[in-house]
Amino acid sequence: MTLSVAVRKAAATAVLGAALAGCGGGTGSSPKPANEIRTGSPAVPAPASPSAAPSGSPQAGAPARVPVLPPGPNGLTPVFERAKQHGDKTVALTFDADMTSDQGPRAASGERFDNPQLISSLRALKVPATIFMTGRWAEEYPDQAKAIGSDPNFEIANHSYSHHAFKSPCYGLPALDGAAATADVDRAFAAFRKAGAVNTVPYFRFPGGCYDDQALRALSPAKVTAVQWDVVSGDAFAKDPDAVAEQVLAGVKPGSVVVMHCTRSAAPVTEQAVRKVVPELRKRGYRFVKVSELIGK
């Protein structure tokens, strides 16, 4: 390998690492009480009952009524972070299946962006989960996308096709403009359908977790609910599953959304951490649910 090639590869890895860390670190804005619509401006309380996405939305083939939040001020895409709960101790584990549009050569050379052992462990532990998948990931691993999207234990949500940013700057990710952003989301849903995934839902997670009002406005034609998180697992590039588990356990509250990753090369200890987190949270009286159940409360 020449020095220039090595430098380019290192730079690409650094950008990916920052973006994955960003997916678990938020955008610097403080969490808002849910159920609230967060728009980048002051939060506006959502109506008590979320609406249901009509048939023919991107989640076609999923259960007929998938709860979504109503649009925010001026039609901006609503943002969900956690459910406001008083008695029911539920928590949603979410996993970003990250693969960018330019990582095909790395996958071809043997790098693994999937994590089948994680999915197997979630099944064995009987933990429902929401997988925020990029369209490029679904193209690379269509059999896995179909299996995940056909399992009632899971739901597939949209993490863009390309894993490019919807706001700039965002951890060095290339940025999409308004029209390209909507097309990127649509392309991801098309990739899920082509793979044969059925349990897809009209939820979206911004690459890197980066967004502002302009991004929410650009996303509004897709008619999705943006889903962020209130608990950062810190699993991206982590080496110690105990540290990841401890961070999750310290942050979880009733109604929490936990962000983790389903990407073996970039989050190698996630599966081990999950096997530590699940029994401990159950011991504390928590029940695991998909994001759709939290939004529907």
Label each residue range with its predicted role.
Residues 90, 113-117, 140-143, 180-190, ...:
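Extracytoplasmic/secreted proteins, especially bacterial periplasmic and envelope-associated proteins
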Residues 101, 109-110, 133-142, 205-212, ...:
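Acidic-and-aromatic substrate-binding clefts and catalytic sites of carbohydrate-active enzymes
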Residues 253-292:
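Catalytic grooves of carbohydrate-active enzymes
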Residues 95-98, 132-136, 159-161, 205-209, ...:
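Active-site-proximal beta-strand/loop segments in catalytic clefts of secreted hydrolases
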Residues 2-113, 145, 276-278, 284-297:
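N-terminal pre-catalytic segment of deacetylase/amide-hydrolase enzymes
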Residues 210-211, 215-251, 286-295:
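His/Asp/Glu-enriched short active-site or ligand-binding loop at hydrolase and phosphoryl-transfer sites
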Residues 119-133, 155, 173-209, 249-261, ...:
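CE4/NodB-like, metal-dependent polysaccharide N-deacetylase domain
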Residues 58-157, 162-168, 172-173, 190-194, ...:
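Active-site beta->alpha N-cap acidic-glycine motif
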